[in-house]
Amino acid sequence: VSYESGKKEVVFSAKENDDNESRKAQVVLTSVKGITIELQIEQAKKPKLAGYWILSEGYAGSNNAEMAWFDVSTGEILKKQFKALNGTELGDTGNALKMYGSKMYAVITGPNWSDDSEDNLSYIEVIDPKTGKSIKRIQFKTADGVAAKPRNIVFDGGKGYISSYSNEVVRLDTASLELDAHAILSGTLAEGLTINDGKIYVCNSGQGQDNKISVVDIQSMTETGVITTAMNPTGIVSAGSGVLYFNTNYPDYVLYKLTLDNEEITEIPGVNVAEMTYLNGNIYTSLFDWNTYMGEIYKFNTATEEVTPVNLDLKGAGIPMLMEY
């Protein structure tokens, strides 16, 4: 509760309600003149989860990235929804799909595996998650205005920060939906990135030929340091102040802990990882072996460092495999 003398206004602030039920409170205000006001306040319950948007990367060069909608209440999955709702293809190689505020952002890298792009093939597709309709297609370009390939995106303070194969981190203003700053990296072919204590940490994979994590000051958008790692760092997550976890990709799918105060790197045994995400103190990793067509999923507790295999009963959960583009 806050009150500023002379303005006759009392401002109430409440923490977000994460419960599945609404909650009520009674507030009693008494003035210096003895006037009492009683208020009954009810805070709405946590919104019911309707479903999930699922991004299919597609096959590079085939222009067949797509989105599916999984309805939680019915267990039904609706495929190829971007084309159905927008009348156009989503694009070539959908590499990431993230929610921030009231919008959803799809990172469309473009065809082939080279580090350069062509006009109108690499962009950020901004989507209304309530309707699946496109809000804006933002053509992705370097600081010099040349078409470039975006790879991943993270958000902080109303801005999106996008890694690029042009060896940059590009800043997106989420209000104006315009690219407004570029940070030049000393590494090559940037992939995953995360934010920790006012710094952006960016994996430079070089498609297997680089071994650096760039440190970018989020205010000045300049590279302020470089951390040497194992070869081919690709994914990275923040797990609290001063602690990051990153993984390397082909040929070694390994998880590492990076302690920032001394830049110590520690290998985490027993986890095979190609993709990962962090949630509530746990890192969830996945790896698919294209030789055996077998997948592996692990949960790694960052506090206890316990590794637990996760076995998904896809049939029991009612979630079919999304392999059709």
Predicted feature residues:
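A short beta-strand motif characteristic of beta-propeller blades
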Residues: 76-89, 133-144, 178-184, 221-228, ...
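Structural motif
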Residues: 61-69, 114-125, 168-171, 208-215, ...
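Repeated scaffold domains used in trafficking and secretory/extracellular systems
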Residues: 87-99, 144-155, 187-197, 229-240, ...
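Surface-exposed binding patches on compact interaction domains or structured appendages
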Residues: 1-13
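A short beta-strand micro-motif common to beta-rich folds, especially ectodomain repeats
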Residues: 10, 21-33
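Short loop/turn segments that connect beta-strands within beta-propeller blades
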Residues: 72-74, 128-132, 173-177, 217-221, ...
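An edge-strand/N-cap motif at the start of beta-rich repeat modules
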Residues: 46-74
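Conserved beta-strand positions in repeat-built beta-propeller and related beta-rich domains
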Residues: 52-62, 106-119, 162-166, 202-208, ...
